Amino acid sequence: MSNSNENILNDLENLNELLRVRREKLNILRSMGIEPYGIDRFERTNLSSDIKNDYENFEGKTVTLAGRIMTKRSHGKASFADIQDRDGRIQIYVRYDNVGGKNYEIFKLLDIGDIIGVTGEVFKTKTGEITINVKDFKLLCKSLQVLPEKWHGLKDPDLRYRQRYVDLIINPSVREVFLKRTKIIKAIREFLDNRGFLEVETPVLHTIAGGAAARPFITHHNALDIDMYLRIALELHLKRLIVGGFEKVYEIGRVFRNEGMDIRHNPEFTLLELYEAYTDYHGMMELTEQLFAYVAEKVNGSTKIIYQGTEIDLTPPWKRITMVDAIKEYVGIDFEKVATDEEARKIAKDLNLELKKPDMKKGEVIALVFDELVEKHLIQPTFVMDYPVEVSPLAKRKRDNPAFTSRFEAFIYGREVANAFSELNDPIDQKERFLEQLRQREAGDEEAHMMDEDFINALEVGMPPTGGLGIGVDRLVMFMTDSYSIRDVILFPTMKPKD
């Protein structure tokens, strides 16, 4: 047997012994009349941060705190421990003479991970450590698992994602990411509410999967005896509300796409979509750059952020460039001079790009070349405008060039962070595009848009000129927290079950 295998077996044996000892201590405590799960409520006077941030006003005063034991050091008839609450850690000092013999024996039975409530006076040790001199304590919960403190934190990414509850206890930086995530979403709402937008909720279960090119999750409604889809976007219901007279609406909600997983994709994720009547995609550009700058300033204190070692300046205005011009700038090919689909496909092959289907149209090739060869170069915030109509079934055509649409995507660090249109409000054009998508679907494209007759009917009632915007909230949080993977900003990311 190799040394590494022997070490693994030894670690498992040691862990099993530690778990056995914890359950033994549980039984000992119960034999002493202590029920480790018996207290329903514990009143605190303060949090650790209150005392550490305002020591002068707390010195010598009696306080009551609660938290999880994170370190524990015994020296005969005196012990020190650190307890952790939601705001941080604080040291406690437990002395035999202060708490009594029985209580001190109980304290000696406690382990790292146990949750206790303490009452005592605030003082500083000789080394200057702010400490609670405990006069009384109560065991609020006995932990039967061993926290990985001996390895100075939980390091295995897979285990961190599966046991986020342990990750949050052990790694303070992880807690900060999710606290900041909450602040980011609050700042988004604040920004939009201040501009007169109305937050709404729309259905999660759809009879037609629409609003994006993505494979849906399918479920079955027993009472109606029909298959339904978990939503892949928020778009079509929100635009129905624009038709209904709500001129500024937004929703922040979960959407679900039955697709692959990587550092930027999780099957369920949080999406912001907003729609505003009587504006266009230029208005959405201004709103997007202002929103990003507002959130960065609110959460990080600056419109300049550091992402993966690169400084990103979110200060408006951002660079604006058409997709065709971006390809010309970074690849050296001018698609304005390409006349036919066949010529476009040849260019893709010459660039060693794999065609997704043999009959790809010029607009689809343009999007392919951009995705594969240009996107990665867009490090500083950039609006890429005027997408081909073939890849934009819900966007309005440009009047001066109907082969392209009034659509943009925003890119930061080579990644798409926002997608917006001047929304298509011509019901006849929309139906024709749905029919084309339907033909693609029948030809085997599972991501092609389904026909939505009710949405066509809504457009026939009449939708005013409208600008729409979608922002992946998780990706926004990644940038604002300098997180490498989307799994680092989702509390419980999708994971394959262990065998």
Curated annotation (Swiss-Prot):
So what does this thing catalyse?
Answer: tRNA(Lys) + L-lysine + ATP = L-lysyl-tRNA(Lys) + AMP + diphosphate
Name the UniProt record assigns to this protein: Lysine--tRNA ligase
A single GO BP term for this record reads: lysyl-tRNA aminoacylation
Subunit composition? Homodimer.
Which positions make up the signal peptide? none
GO MF, any single term: tRNA binding
Q: Which UniProt keywords apply?
A: Aminoacyl-tRNA synthetase, ATP-binding, Cytoplasm, Ligase, Magnesium, Metal-binding, Nucleotide-binding, Protein biosynthesis
The top EC class, named as a word, is ligase
User: What is the annotated localization of this protein?
Assistant: Cytoplasm
- Segments traversing the membrane: none
| Taxonomic source organism | Caldanaerobacter subterraneus subsp. tengcongensis (strain DSM 15242 / JCM 11007 / NBRC 100824 / MB4) (Thermoanaerobacter tengcongensis)
Q: Name one Pfam family in it.
A: tRNA-synt_2
Q: Which GO terms describe its cellular component?
A: cytosol
Similarity comment: family membership: Belongs to the class-II aminoacyl-tRNA synthetase family.
Q: Which residues bind Mg(2+) 2?
A: E416
Record-linked InterPro entries: Aa-tRNA-synt_II, aa-tRNA-synth_II, aa-tRNA-synth_II/BPL/LPL, Lys-tRNA-ligase_II, Lys-tRNA-ligase_II_bac/euk, Lys-tRNA-ligase_II_N, Lys-tRNA-synth_II_C, NA-bd_OB-fold
Q: Which residues bind Mg(2+) 1?
A: E409, E416
Essential cofactor(s): Mg(2+)
Q: How is the cofactor bound?
A: Binds 3 Mg(2+) ions per subunit.
Quote the EC number. 6.1.1.6
